[in-house]
């Protein structure tokens, strides 16, 4: 059973203090995995800014001081979202450091300690393929981690499976929406963190043993809709 297969597995979750990351971490804990979280928010987990090389090194060293192996890595930490009008060079670099460089470097630090059959999950976004105005830093980071996924999958062939998940609208407060916010979604509702956690659990299980290098979009079908003015889409209101 999927409830038993994660017992005593060593699981790492970045950005695991809140939202999707916390839900994923909690679901692994519920299944008796040994979970290590890093987040810049204060708490009982390892506290640090993963944009900093030395923080990632210290975090990896702490995990490896207690275990000689790692089974699962979930790169979830949220990059900064700012657009081209307001985002500075430094802020854009920071977003890429959190969203792309940190996942790459954390895997690099731990790759020699991955068990055979390890699983790496990178949390991207449906914004890796579609955009709203003024979201360049976030969108670039999410596109980067989606591409990093298939590169790592090939490099780590035979050692670990690497997949990414692209969430759509996920309400981390589990708000139940009615009206257009819900009905615009082909699935009929807005998503919640469990929708993502369930997929992460599946991808880390043996049931997904033939899946690697893939990106799975969990967005209630929003990115599959054709939207044309006046034709099952939006209407211009003057």
Task: Name each model-derived stretch.
Residues 76-81, 221:
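Conserved NAD(P)H cofactor-binding loop of Rossmann-fold oxidoreductase domains
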Residues 83-96, 181:
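Substrate-binding pocket helix/loop in short-chain dehydrogenase/reductase
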Residues 107, 141, 149:
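Active-site helix of classical SDR
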Residues 112, 154-158, 209:
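Alpha-helical segment proximal to the catalytic Tyr-Lys
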Residues 164, 179-211, 218-220:
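C-terminal helical subdomain
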């Amino acid at each position: 059973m999927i409830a038993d297969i994660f017992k005593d597995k060593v699981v790492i979750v970045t950005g695991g203090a809140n939202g999707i990351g916390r839900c994923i971490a909690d679901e692994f804990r519920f299944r008796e995995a040994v979970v290590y979280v890093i987040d810049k928010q204060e708490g009982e987990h390892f506290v640090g800014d993963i944009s900093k090389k030395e923080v990632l090194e210290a975090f990896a060293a702490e995990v490896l001081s207690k275990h000689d192996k790692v089974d699962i890595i979930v790169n979830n930490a949220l990059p900064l979202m700012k657009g081209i009008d307001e985002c500075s060079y430094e802020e854009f670099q920071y977003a890429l450091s959190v969203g792309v460089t940190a996942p790459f470097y954390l895997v690099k630090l731990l790759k020699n300690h991955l068990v055979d059959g390890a699983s790496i999950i990178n949390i991207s976004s449906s914004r890796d393929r579609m955009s709203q105005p003024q979201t360049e830093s976030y969108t670039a980071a999410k596109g980067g981690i989606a591409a990093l996924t298939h590169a790592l999958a090939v490099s780590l062939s035979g050692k670990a499976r690497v997949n990414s998940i692209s969430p759509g609208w996920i309400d981390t407060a589990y708000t139940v929406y009615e009206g257009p916010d819900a009905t615009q979604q082909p699935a009929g509702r807005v998503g919640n963190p469990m929708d993502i956690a369930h997929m992460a659990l599946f991808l880390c299980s043996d049931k997904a043993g033939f899946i690697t290098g893939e990106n799975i979009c969990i967005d209630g079908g929003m990115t599959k809709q054709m939207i044309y003015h006046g034709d099952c889409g939006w209407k211009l209101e003057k």
